[in-house]
Amino acid sequence: MHPKQQRESFRSKQYTGTTSGMCDNYLQANMIILPKEYAFEFLLFCQRNPKSCPIIDVLEEGVTTPQIADADIRTDLPKYRIYRNGQLDKEVTDIKDKWRADFVTFLIGCSFTFEKALIENGIRLLHQEQERVVPMYKTNIPCEKAGRFEGNMVVSMRALEPEEIDKAVKITERFETSHGSPVHIGNPEEIGIKDIDNPDYGESISFDKKKRTPVFWACGVTPQNVGLNVKPPIMIAHAPGHMLITDQLEEK
C-alpha cells in the first residue's frame, strides 16, 4: 500500500496499530510537538544527539503539513500520546481538538525504515512475526544536554542469531537518518536494562536467550523520555511504534 492510502486508513480510524513493516522503502518518522518557547532548545538537543534524534523535518510554527509527506500531522498517525507537565495524560487517534497556533513539530528518523533491508537479507524480525510493537527500553546512556532538555537514551531491541549480527550492523550503518548502527550488543544490564522481558515502551517478544542475542539501536522515543524531565505544560508525540509514514523514499 502507498503511504497516502495507508495514512488515509489512520485518518479514518480503520487502523490504529503499529506501523512496523508498512510501506516498504518509505521513511517512517517519530514525532514531537512542543510549544514554540521550547522549540529552539529541543532543536539544539536533537543536533547534539543525532544518533537518537536524527531530524528529517521541522515544521514552522502552526504548520500541520510537512515537506516530506502530503499529510496532516494532526490526523495521519495511527495513535498519539499527550503529555501534560511531564505526565502521560492520554492516548488518542487524532489531535485536531488539541492543536494550537504556537505548536512546532519535529519529525525524527525511525528504525522501522531499515527493517525491510534486514528482512531482505535473511534476518528474521521477531516483533513482526509475533505481531508485537518493537520493545523499547530506557537506558543509562546519557544524552548531551541542551538547555532544559537532558536525560538518557531510549533504545529499541531486536533479538538476532549470532551469525546475523555483523550483517545487521553493516546494513543499518547506512541508514544514518534512521539511527544507523546499533549502540549496544549483548548484555542489557550493561546499559541499565534490568529486565529484557519488561520493556518501558512497546511490547515484549519471546525468544530463546541461549540462541539469540539482544541488539539495541538508538530510538526516537528518546525525546519523549527526555521531555518528561522538562515537564512542558503540553507535549504531543506519536505513540511508540505508531509512526508517521512519509512520502520520501529511504534512498534519498
Curated annotation (Swiss-Prot):
The answer to whether the entry has keyword Lyase is yes
- Fetch the Pfam families from UniProt: D-Glu_cyclase
Annotated signal peptide: none
Q: Which Enzyme Commission numbers does its entry carry?
A: 4.2.1.-
**UniProt KW Heme keyword:** no
Q: Alphabetically list the UniProt keywords.
A: Lyase
Domain of life where this protein originates: Bacteria
Gene Ontology MF, one: lyase activity
Q: What class of enzyme is it?
A: lyase
- PANTHER family to which the protein is assigned, alphabetical: D-GLUTAMATE CYCLASE, MITOCHONDRIAL
Recorded family membership: Belongs to the D-glutamate cyclase family.
Q: What is this protein called?
A: Putative hydro-lyase OB3382
